[in-house]
């Protein structure tokens, strides 16, 4: 275990848009350190979104992240031999990382042939309140709503 808390390193903006969230998305998408491949996929997906919908790719991306962002989630809490699913609010940084993770998971599960098409379609779906990533957020919110009775077990 480390002696001190690790400092949070500042993320630089991506090369095209200068956006830190896009950089985080690229880093999460990357496999085996192949950042250039991940960047190409994302920028091509943004171009494809512009062709299909006429909106700017980065705007659709930001709207999709906003729509998939969870406000509450459930955490397991053990009380007297019973485990309760306790609803808790989600920190802003975790909201962002969860939305990125869920969009990528949903993208990888889609059945289009090319990753560019999968990502573009999932981002457009999420921006318009559809798709697997948005459904995941809805499920998490429903779970928190169903377990509202245990909210007093918060820590």
UniProtKB/Swiss-Prot annotation:
Pfam families: Ribosomal_S7 (PF00177). GO terms for molecular function: rRNA binding; structural constituent of ribosome; tRNA binding. One of its GO terms (biological process) is translation. PROSITE patterns: RIBOSOMAL_S7. InterPro entries: Ribosomal_uS7 (IPR000235), Ribosomal_uS7_bac/org-type (IPR005717), Ribosomal_uS7_CS (IPR020606), Ribosomal_uS7_dom (IPR023798), Ribosomal_uS7_dom_sf (IPR036823). Keywords: Ribonucleoprotein, Ribosomal protein, RNA-binding, rRNA-binding, tRNA-binding. GO terms for cellular component: small ribosomal subunit. SUPFAM superfamilies: Ribosomal protein S7 (SSF47973). It comes from the Bacteria. One of the primary rRNA binding proteins, it binds directly to 16S rRNA where it nucleates assembly of the head domain of the 30S subunit. Is located at the subunit interface close to the decoding center, probably blocks exit of the E-site tRNA. Part of the 30S ribosomal subunit. Contacts proteins S9 and S11. Belongs to the universal ribosomal protein uS7 family. This is Small ribosomal subunit protein uS7. It comes from Helicobacter pylori (strain Shi470).
């Amino acid at each position: 275990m480390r002696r001190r808390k690790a400092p949070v390193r500042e993320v630089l903006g991506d090369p095209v848009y200068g956006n830190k969230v896009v950089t985080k998305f690229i880093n999460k998408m990357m496999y085996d350190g192949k950042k250039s491949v991940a960047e190409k996929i994302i920028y091509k997906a943004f171009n494809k979104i512009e062709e299909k919908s006429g909106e700017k790719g980065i705007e659709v991306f930001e709207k999709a992240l906003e729509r998939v962002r969870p406000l509450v989630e459930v955490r397991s809490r053990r009380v007297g031999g019973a485990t309760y699913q306790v609803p808790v609010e989600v920190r802003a940084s975790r909201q962002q990382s969860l939305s990125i993770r869920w969009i990528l998971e949903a993208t990888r599960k889609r059945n289009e042939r090319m990753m560019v098409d999968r990502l573009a379609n999932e981002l457009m779906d999420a921006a318009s309140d559809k798709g697997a990533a948005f459904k995941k957020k809805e499920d998490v919110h429903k779970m928190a709503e169903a377990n509202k009775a245990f909210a007093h077990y918060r820590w």
